[in-house]
Each structure stands twice: as C-alpha cells, then as structure tokens.
C-alpha cells in the first residue's frame, strides 16, 4: 500500500465516523509564539483545547505537516543516521473536543490498524500510564479495561509519567497516554534476550500515541477533572508506511523513492552500496522535503529564528551533496521531485514551484561562494598557525568555519591530516553544545502577543467581541471585562492604565499588518483615551488605554468613538499596499510574495520576496503604476464568502494569515484581489498620491519598500521640495541643476584627494629616506629601530614598505602612538628571516606596551594600551637584535 493510500484511508476512516477532515495548517505556527515550528497535529487545535476558540465541529482528523529542527524538538543531527528521524514529517491524527473519549479512541485505533491496514493483531502491544504518586494519580485502569477487549493482559504494559503522560505546559490541560507498538521481530532489534517494549532498538516500534486529556493541572499541581475530556492522537505517516510496506527504514518507503531516484540521477551513486554515502542520500532527501515545505509555507533563509534553521537545513544538505560529488547546484532539482510526488496531497507546493526552486538555487549559489571564502580563510589560518609553530587548529576557528561559513567538518579534518595538524575537537564540541543550548533558549518565535490567563478565562466563559467598524466609527456597547496588569478587575479609577473588552466595537484590533485603532471610550462618568487596540484569539478585541477621568466599571454602557482622521489615513495606506503588491508582481514577476507588512496612519512598509536589487527605473515604474491606478479611481468591492470559493476566484491568500471557513475578499476590479480583514478606502482615488520613500534589502531574497499615501505623501514631497530649493540656493543653481553641480563638486573633491595622497606619499618617501640615514649596522646587517609619526597601523605599514624599497637587506622596528594606543611593526627582508623571525620578535617586545600580536617571518604588527612604554619596547628590540645578529 502506498503512503498516499494510507493517508487517504486514514482520513476516510475517520470521516465515516463523523470527523471533519481538516486541512493541514502551515508548518509555521503564525498564531502560536511558543513554537518555532508546528511539531504535532494538535498545534492548530491548541486554542480549541484551551477553550479560547470554538470550532463548528467537535471531532476532527488531519494529516499535518510537521517540522522538528531547532528549539526544544530538534532531530536535525540524527537525520540520516537512524531509520526513523526526520526534520519534516506528516502526522496523522484524530481529535475529539469534548465529544468521545477513551473507549472510542481505543476502538478506532484498533480497528484502523487491524482491519483497514491489516496489521497482525498478535504483534500489537498497548502501553498505559502506571500512575504517579506526586500527582496523586493511580494506574489508568480505565484505558487498561478498554484495551483488554482486544489484547491479552501480557501485552498491555504500564509505563511511567515521562513516557505515558502528556501536558501542554506547567499548567492547563493534560492527561495519560496510551501508545500502540508493533513487534517487528527479533531480527530487527538489538538481539538482547531481555529486549522488550521500551527498549531503544527498533524491534518494538511505537506506532500511534493516544492522549487522553482529562485533567486541568492547576498552579499548585493539583489535578482537576475537565468537564469535557478530549482526545488528541498522533501517528507518523512515514513510520506506519515503513511497517505496512515491510521495509527496514522510513527512507526505504515510497515517500522517499522519487528523491532517491533524483539523487541517483544527479550523482551517479546507487543507493544501498555504501553505508556512509547512504547517510548522505537520506539527509538530502529529508532536507529537500523540509526545505520545499518550509519555503512553500513562507520561511526564507536568514541568520535568525526559523530562517536560520532553514539555512542550516539547506547547507547541511548541500554539504552532503559534496560527499556524493555534487559540486554544482542540485538541491532545487530534488525539491522539484518532492513537489511532484506530493502534489495530490499538497497542490500548493507545485503552485509555488518557481518561487521555491528560486529560493533554494539562490541559497545554493550563496553557499558555494561562502564555502570558497571559508576555504581561503582556513588556508590562511593554517599558514599563520604554522608560522607561529602551532600544531593544532583551535576549536574556535573550526566552529567559525562550521557556523559562519557552513564548512564541512570532514573537509577541515582532511586538510588538517594532510598538513600534519591536529584538530581541537573538544573545544569545537563545547562551542557546538553552547550554540544548541542558546538555540533551545533564545529562538525567535512569531512575535505574537502571549495571552494572559484573564483572557483565556474570558474565552472559556464564552465572552467575545463583535466588530462593527466596517460600517461605523462609533457605537454604543457594554463593558464585558476590565483587565489591569494581567488581572481581571471590576473597575478602573482615573489615572490608571486599563484594557477594556466590550461586547461590540467599531475599533479595529491590530491584525494582518494593520495597526490597531485609537480613539476614546466615554462612560456615564468616565472617559478613556484608547492608544491601541488588539485582536486576541477567541474573537476578543481589547482596547488599551488610560482612564482620563471618572471611574470605569464592568457592566456599564459606554460610547466607543474611533479617531476618524487616523482611521482614514490607515485605510489609505492599506489600499495603497494592495495596489503596491499587485504592481510589484507586474513589474518584477510572479515570484513576488508578501513576506510581511505594516500599515499605519503615517506610513506603510511592505516586505516581499525578490532576489535582486530594484533599479531606479523599476522603482520609478512601480511608483508610476500605483499612481496611475489611483487616478483611474476604481471602486473597491468587498465580499464575504467561503474560503474555497474565494480561492477559486484567484484571490491571493497570504501564508502568514490563518483563515477561517468564511473570509473577506477585497477586490480592486481588474487589478487586485486579496483575502483581507483590514479597513480600506471606498475608491482608489481617495488615496490621492503615493510616494516610495525607501527601498532596501532586509534579508537574503527579501526586499522592503517603505512608502507614504495621501496627505502624508504630499507633506513628504513638500519637505523634499523645500530641501531641494535650499540646496539650490547654497549651490547658486536652479533646482534642476543641483544634481549636475553636486557631481562636479564630488569630481573636484576626488581629484583633490588624489593630489593630497600623492603629496603625502612624496612626504613619506622623503621622510623614509631621511630616517634611513639613521640606520645602524649590527653584525653586518642594517638595522633601523625608531619611533616615528604615524596615525595608525596602515600608515606604519606604508612607511615600512618605503624602507624595504631602499633596503636591499635589513631589519626595521618601528613604533608609533595615537592617543592611548601604541603600535609596533617589525619588518625583515627575505634573506634574513632564518636569523630573525618578525613574528617571534614582536611577541617578545609587545608585552612591554601591554599588548599582543604576531605575524609572518618577514612582517609582523602588534598593538598595546601603554604608549608611555613605547620607547622601552624599542630599546628591548634593539637589545635583542644585537644579541641575535
């Protein structure tokens, strides 16, 4: 049975039992700041389990895209080395939100595995929670009883909390687990006579985990039974496919066959003939899948957070490609094999094919360049270490090459061996462990606001806010809750900061890149200045403000009034953003995708994918086309419809947004169509004017445009014109002559700088000739030890070069100081390096000025922070040279 058939059979099985088949959420959990990646099927239902979000169904089934690389769940280093570890995988799961519980969950799992999948009943085991005295919980006898309907007692095993109890955090929903295992036979395992379920080998393979969410763990650790227990299950598709297809590893399933075939075609290597090269094939296949799905869901390579993990995944695959002889870009072709093989389940991959392959190819080219730079650095450092007499490559250098340049450790080790160098493996391992710890502790999430317990409680009680701000900027409503410092309160006196929740509001809560509204809330005896508005999960809109006067109370009827001018300016910028997005795709190409945005009353910022700097002509064309659409003055059309219906119209859905079944489509007829919950103008002509103020690169393959619309754009052009006229006045030229006049001034300045450098060089040459007359002879060798005037080490080097031009044979030791810094330089002509080593000499004298340094046999530099000891250092150099010459 193919993996695609297993996936379909699973979803069909649960659909027939009243489950809603829910589409996989993004592998990037944009609405959960606690997670780096979606790592389990329950992630998209987390707020439902917490009672913060209601769904139109109470049982669901999914095949969820998951990623485990970075953060707490990190399988990256094990990938390719084991039969089961992956960075990207699919998790099959069924869920109950207060509907069925243990009895049905056990029955469904048993029937699917034994009847639909045909797994042998006599090979299956089940585990249950053995209980926990600290949690005051006994063994899960209820689950044991249900399993006893299908399994003999000796194949129902108890395991401790660390294996068979699941919790969402230190507090909140939690409960015991049951795992289903299959005995694959003694030939698969470790061969030990006492091998049994729980052994680390693959004989007793964990297939399916059933979590019985039946408790709410309180802050004091007590377990309170949930009023509506729930079910969360997970089974890896790759793992169950390996069992059903009777292959030794997940990588031998049909899921990975297209990638293995493509790698064989590109490299000429036949999988299964060399264990070490097989590891590389597995790594490339796995990482190619991960990269395709990550980029498809909106991740881009960068040096932090999710983008950094993606970059590491890509570069790890590329390094393994080199082990197979793949020196040219190849991973984008493996990614195409992924997309084509997964198109039935994930058609969105093929839709983004050009974009995904372009991102990967761009990163491959950058990596090859980086690898070349790293190779040069390694060669230079080995040369320096040899000159200094060192025999070991430091761990810090290895780590820099590995972390900064993505340099393969094997290449470093091989080069070291060829040159009779050792490698500081312990130092490198220590730095790697520190990096892993920092990755676990300090990864950057999605930046979403954490929801306080007060709001979780409100959601659980069914409190929500109805937004009426599309149609009106003022409304009357009732105060449903007041929150101060994360705690719900009954009232808020004058002068206090407060967060206000009402039953309905015209205030737009920050979402989709648009900032929250500002305005006032007026009560019977109070007035609140609203400085921001937030949209929280569970349809809660929170007004953040300060009580200006009076006392605000829960239950009061209040008047909510949005600042009309600010809302209007925000609307202009939001509609302008839609125009800009559409124009960018027309001018630059369909590969342009939104990578982030900010829409405010005073400006807009739009981040998008593009792989080259935007030329001045392109930028002018972008600005012209946006303004052309403004002048056309098109009517905006806003419609609500089903998500599938909207997508069929070609509406653009943004990967960072989470959409419900009903969506709002904003259309500028004939020009733009996007899913958007923000506020807009009625006609494009309302924008008036659009001006780009800045364009820049913010990451590899990501550009940013900042722009102004409406009166803000007009103000900007007015200020710009004022500055232009001021500059024209200073230059005594007309406004249109300013650029030409500045070009002439810059050309004159450049010529004068060249003349100045020539004069300096002439003076230095003359000074060098004068100083050279003061050289003394020591043992038949000309030696110049002197304190000179030089602003920095570079000037000192230039002076030394002048001496070398005039000295056919000799040694120079020069010293200079600038402020609280002292500089030393030792130069030795090639014929004398066997008698005087510049690097060794400078190490001996630099200690005098409280510094350090080194260098080659013929030239070395050093610096220190005790300039008052400079003459002592020079005297020591003179003394040492007399002894050695």
From Swiss-Prot:
One of its GO terms (biological process) is alanyl-tRNA aminoacylation. CDD domains: AlaRS_core. It is an enzyme of class 6 (ligase). It is found in: Cytoplasm. SMART domains: tRNA_SAD. Belongs to the class-II aminoacyl-tRNA synthetase family. PANTHER family: ALANINE--TRNA LIGASE, CYTOPLASMIC (PTHR11777:SF9), ALANYL-TRNA SYNTHETASE (PTHR11777). This is Alanine--tRNA ligase. It comes from Syntrophobacter fumaroxidans (strain DSM 10017 / MPOB).
């Amino acid at each position: 049975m193919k993996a695609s058939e297993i996936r379909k059979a699973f979803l069909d099985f649960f659909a027939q039992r009243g489950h809603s088949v829910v589409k996989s959420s993004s592998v990037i959990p944009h609405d959960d700041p606690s997670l780096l990646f979606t790592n389990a099927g329950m992630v998209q239902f987390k707020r439902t389990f917490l009672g913060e979000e209601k769904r139109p169904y109470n049982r669901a089934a999914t095949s969820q895209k998951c990623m485990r690389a970075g953060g707490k769940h990190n399988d990256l280093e094990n990938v390719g080395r084991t039969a089961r570890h992956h960075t990207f995988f699919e998790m099959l799961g069924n869920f109950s939100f207060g509907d069925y519980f243990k009895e049905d969950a056990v029955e469904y799992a048993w029937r699917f595995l034994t009847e639909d999948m045909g797994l042998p009943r006599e090979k299956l085991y089940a585990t249950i929670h053995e209980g926990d005295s600290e949690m005051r919980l006994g063994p899960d006898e209820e689950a044991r009883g249900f399993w006893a309907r299908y399994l003999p007692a000796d194949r129902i095993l108890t395991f401790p909390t660390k294996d068979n109890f699941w919790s969402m955090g230190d507090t909140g929903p939690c409960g015991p687990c049951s795992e289903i295992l299959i005995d694959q036979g003694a030939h698969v395992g470790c061969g030990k006579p006492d091998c049994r379920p729980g052994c680390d080998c693959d004989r007793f393979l964990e297939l399916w985990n059933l979590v019985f969410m039946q408790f709410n763990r309180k802050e004091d650790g007590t377990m309170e039974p949930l009023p509506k227990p729930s079910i969360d299950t997970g089974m890896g598709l790759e793992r169950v496919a390996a069992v059903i297809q009777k292959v030794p590893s997940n990588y031998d399933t049909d899921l990975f066959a297209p990638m293995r075939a493509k790698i064989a075609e590109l490299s000429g290597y036949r999988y299964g003939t060399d264990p070490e090269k097989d590891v590389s094939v597995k790594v490339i296949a796995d990482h190619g899948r991960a990269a395709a799905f990550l980029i498809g869901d909106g991740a881009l390579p960068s040096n932090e957070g999710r983008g950094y993990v993606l970059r590491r995944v890509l570069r790890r695959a590329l390094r393994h490609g080199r082990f197979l002889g793949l020196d040219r870009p190849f991973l984008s072709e493996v990614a195409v094999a992924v997309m084509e093989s997964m198109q039935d389940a994930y058609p969105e991959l093929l839709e983004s094919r050009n974009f995904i392959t372009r991102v990967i190819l761009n990163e491959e080219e950058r990596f090859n360049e980086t690898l070349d730079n790293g190779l040069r650095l390694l060669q230079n450092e080995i040369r320096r270490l040899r000159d200094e007499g060192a025999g070991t490559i430091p761990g810090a250098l290895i780590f820099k090459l590995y972390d900064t340049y993505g340099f393969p450790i094997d290449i470093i080790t091989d080069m070291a061996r060829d040159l009779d160098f050792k490698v500081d493996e312990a130092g490198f391992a220590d730095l790697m462990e520190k990096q892993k710890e920092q990755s676990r502790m300090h990864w950057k999430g999605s930046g979403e606001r954490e929801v306080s317990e007060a709001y979780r409680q409100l959601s659980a009680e069914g409190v929500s806010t109805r937004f009426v701000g599309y149609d009106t900027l003022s409304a009357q409503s009732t105060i449903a809750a007041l929150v101060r410092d994360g705690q719900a309160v009954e009232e808020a006196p004058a002068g206090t900061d407060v967060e206000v929740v009402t039953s309905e509001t015209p205030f737009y809560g920050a979402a989709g890149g648009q900032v929250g509204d500002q305005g006032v809330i007026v009560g019977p005896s109070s007035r609140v200045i609203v400085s921001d508005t937030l949209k929280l999960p569970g349809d809660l809109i929170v007004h953040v403000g300060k009580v200006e006067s009076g006392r605000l109370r829960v239950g009061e009827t209040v008047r909510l009034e949005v600042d009309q001018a600010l809302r209007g300016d925000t609307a202009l910028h939001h509609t302008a953003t839609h125009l800009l997005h559409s124009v960018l795709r027309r001018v630059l190409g369909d590969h342009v995708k939104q990578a982030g945005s900010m829409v405010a009353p005073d400006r807009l910022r739009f981040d998008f994918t593009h792989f080259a700097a935007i030329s001045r002509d392109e930028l002018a064309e972008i600005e012209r086309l946006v303004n052309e659409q403004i002048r056309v003055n098109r009517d905006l059309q806003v419609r609500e419809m089903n998500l599938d219906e909207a997508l069929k119209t070609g509406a653009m859905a943004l990967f960072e947004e989470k959409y419900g079944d009903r969506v709002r489509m904003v259309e500028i007829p004939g020009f733009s169509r996007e899913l958007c919950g923000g506020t807009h103008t009625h006609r494009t002509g309302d924008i008036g004017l659009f001006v780009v103020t800045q364009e820049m690169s913010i990451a590899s393959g990501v550009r940013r445009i900042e722009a102004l619309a409406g009166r803000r754009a007009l103000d900007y052009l007015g200020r710009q014109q004022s500055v232009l006229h001021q500059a024209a006045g200073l230059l005594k030229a007309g406004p249109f002559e300013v650029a030409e006049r500045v070009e002439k001034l810059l050309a004159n300045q450049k010529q004068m700088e060249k003349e100045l450098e020539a004069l300096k060089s002439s003076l230095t040459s003359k000074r060098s000739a004068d100083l050279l007359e003061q050289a003394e002879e020591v043992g038949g060798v000309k030696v110049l030890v002197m304190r000179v005037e030089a602003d920095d080490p570079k000037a000192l080097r230039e002076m030394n070069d002048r001496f070398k031009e005039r000295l056919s044979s000799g040694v120079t030791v020069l010293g200079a100081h600038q402020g609280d810094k002292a500089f030393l330089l030792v130069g030795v002509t090639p014929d004398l390096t066997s008698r005087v080593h510049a690097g060794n000499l400078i190490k001996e004298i630099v200690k005098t000025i409280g510094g350090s340094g080194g260098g080659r046999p013929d030239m070395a530099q050093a610096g220190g922070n005790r300039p008052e000891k400079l003459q002592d250092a020079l005297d020591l150099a003179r003394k040492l040279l007399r002894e050695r010459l």
